[in-house]
Amino acid sequence: MSKRDFYEVLGVSRDASERDIKKAYKRLAMKFHPDRNQGDESAADKFKEVKEAYEVLTDSQKKAAYDQYGHAAFEQGGGGFGGGFGGGGADFGDIFGDVFGDIFGGGRRGGGGHRAQRGADLRYNMELTLEEAVRGVTKEIEVPTLVHCDSCDGSGAKKGSSAETCGTCHGHGQVQMRQGFFAVQQTCPTCHGKGKIIKDPCNECHGQGRKQKTKTLNVKIPAGVDTGDRIRLSGEGEAGEMGAPSGDLYVQVHVKEHHIFERDGNNLYCEVPVSFAMAALGGEVEVPTLDGRVSLKVPSETQTGRMFRMRGKGVKGVRGGGIGDLIVKLVVETPVNLSSRQKELLKEFEESCGGEAATKHKPKSEGFFNGVKKFFDDLTS
């Protein structure tokens, strides 16, 4: 089957810049990466095709040869792979490491020698109460992870023995294969990129150098965190291969809903009910805060929904910026379960507000009905 044009594979024009080529490669490599398409042979083939196109079009010599001769440029002098194995040559692993190293927890292997793979990063979802998030707290957590085997010190080899340098790649973890007059590096098929062969594996970890364990950690949560904040614990992720550095543990914070307060940034919000008599006549009402109850003076003739700001009663931000405020919304309650006498008093009150002077006791009603009147006047004019 004939190969597709490399420019077509990456979806770029022939005069595309190296930056455009790299951008297209990253997008397609992410899309077709085997770790994201496990078991999908079609995606694996497309990933190889994209990688091959990128390797050619970002190398000035290869690109010039391809632009002049097409795929035939890489089939000269033997037509395909040949020339045996070697340890040197150009390294095309750099861009692969740049794109996928952070996503899949991997390091990258350079042409100058093998570097063991860093351990994978882990994530732990932690749920906090609002009080814990605002004040800070230390939480004990248990994390299942991979740790270095203490029996072999992470080497994978039985105590008293050691791993041997791979004879195929001479410890590089990669081998060089020749395609036409170009050399391409690939993962060593003997040691699978590790650079070493373990002939006498450790009985504890079966040659892996790592074993499963549940770690207990005390995590200090700083005051002021909020949902979406992430705390990094360096080196508390999975242990790396063959003694390589461990990954990191990221604690993802989620703050549970509170039955009184809502949080927006460093400010807190709450609703406080008041009787219609207090709203009309004024008075004082107790308001809950995270530090205890405080009194709020309610002015006379307060309408429902009015907001009051209590400065410094909010949250101290984890990134600084001072302490937020508590915003109190007063909600005027309509009385229920009235006795006959209470109903009579309310009727008397309503009648006393009637007549031409009624609107002066109901400022919102006056504005509303004036607006309704104007609306219908406009319709009929």
UniProtKB/Swiss-Prot annotation:
Record keywords, A-Z: Chaperone, Cytoplasm, DNA replication, Metal-binding, Repeat, Stress response, Zinc, Zinc-finger
SMART domains given in the database record: DnaJ
Subunit and interaction comment: Homodimer.
Domain J: 5-70
Binding sites annotated in the UniProt record for Zn(2+) 2: 166, 169, 188, 191
Binding site for Zn(2+) 1: 149, 152, 202, 205
Domain writeup: The J domain is necessary and sufficient to stimulate DnaK ATPase activity. Zinc center 1 plays an important role in the autonomous, DnaK-independent chaperone activity of DnaJ. Zinc center 2 is essential for interaction with DnaK and for DnaJ activity.
Cellular compartment(s): Cytoplasm
Alphabetical list of CDD domains matching this protein: DnaJ, DnaJ_C, DnaJ_zf
Function: Participates actively in the response to hyperosmotic and heat shock by preventing the aggregation of stress-denatured proteins and by disaggregating proteins, also in an autonomous, DnaK-independent fashion. Unfolded proteins bind initially to DnaJ; upon interaction with the DnaJ-bound protein, DnaK hydrolyzes its bound ATP, resulting in the formation of a stable complex. GrpE releases ADP from DnaK; ATP binding to DnaK triggers the release of the substrate protein, thus completing the reaction cycle.
Family annotation (InterPro entries): DnaJ, DnaJ_C, DnaJ_domain, DnaJ_domain_CS, HSP40/DnaJ_pept-bd, HSP_DnaJ_Cys-rich_dom, HSP_DnaJ_Cys-rich_dom_sf, J_dom_sf
Stretches forming CXXCXGXG motif repeats: 149-156, 166-173, 188-195, 202-209
Family (UniProt): Belongs to the DnaJ family.
Protein name: Chaperone protein DnaJ
Keyword Thylakoid: no
Zn finger (CR-type) start-end: 136-214
Pfam families, per database record: DnaJ (PF00226), DnaJ_C (PF01556), DnaJ_CXXCXGXG (PF00684)
GO biological process, one term: protein refolding
Organism of origin: Vibrio parahaemolyticus serotype O3:K6 (strain RIMD 2210633)
Cellular component annotations (GO), alphabetically ordered: cytoplasm
Disulfide bonding pattern of the chain: none
Cofactor(s) the protein needs: Zn(2+)
Gene name for this UniProt entry: dnaJ
Keyword Protease annotated: no
Cofactor note: Binds 2 Zn(2+) ions per monomer.
Gene Ontology molecular function terms on file: ATP binding; heat shock protein binding; unfolded protein binding; zinc ion binding
